[in-house]
Regions:
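Conserved pre-ATP/AMP-binding loop-to-beta segment of ANL
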Residues: 49-51, 174-177, 186-219
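Structural core segment of the AMP-binding/adenylate-forming
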Residues: 112-196
């Protein structure tokens, strides 16, 4: 009960623990909250200009810093793009990206709108990604153009293409965040979408939070 007071609840829980069906237990039953709101929104008034995220990339030799207010903006921009792609509460999204700021934005954006995200390690080959796509059966796959390993550029898009060809339940759309690492990046019309282009179309939108019952999955 003491821990529950550290969380913002849109609707307070009616019961702290329901253990009527062991070994399955439900915590904070009836409470409605949102992980993105607790990670970002609740800090805007008191910590808006405080650093919330620092991403130091050995791949691009850059460091990017975001205050809570800047993080809020980036997450809402990403959430607005997801909504444009008709991703909503309960939909599943697979994220196949390296350690980059946009991976964080994508996870928080999914949580914000109530979509369930699954992060797949970007070191996995196409076959392994295909297996996870079949398990999750996502509405959308989010990826990057490329990453770097030991100084070598690793293009992700060919791996994604191979995975989608092998999967039994591939997503209908692929959202690609390009950092300009792969000069040969090729998008398949009708399936692949460029994040930056979509974000410019959508513009800056404050996306409402989808409040979830405490035991609903966010990831």
């Amino acid at each position: 009960e003491a821990q529950s007071r550290l969380i913002h609840w849109e609707t307070p829980p009616q019961q702290i623990l329901d253990d009527a069906n062991p070994p399955f237990r439900r915590w904070f039953v009836g409470g409605r909250t949102n992980l993105c709101y607790n990670a970002v929104d609740r800090h805007l008034d008191s910590r808006g200009e405080q650093l919330a995220l620092v991403v130091a990339s050995s791949e691009t030799a850059t460091t990017r810093q975001f205050t809570y207010r800047q993080l809020y903006r980036q997450v809402n921009d990403f959430a607005a793009v997801l909504r444009r792609l008709d991703v909503s509460h309960g939909d599943r999204v697979v994220i196949y990206m390296p350690n980059m700021a946009e991976a964080v934005f994508a996870m928080l954006a999914c949580a914000r709108i109530g979509a369930v995200h699954s992060v797949v390690f970007c070191g996995f080959a196409a076959h392994n990604l295909a297996l996870r796509l079949d398990d999750a059966q996502p509405k959308l796959l989010i990826t990057a153009d490329a990453g770097m390993r030991s100084g070598k550029v690793i293009a992700y898009k060919p791996l994604v293409d191979a995975a989608l060809a092998a999967a039994q339940a591939p997503p209908a759309q692929v959202l690609v965040v390009s950092r300009g690492l792969d000069p040969d990046l090729s998008l398949q019309p009708g399936r692949d979408l460029d994040y930056a282009s979509l974000q410019r179309e959508v513009g800056q939108v404050d996306v409402p939070v989808q409040w979830l019952e405490s035991n609903e999955p966010s990831y």
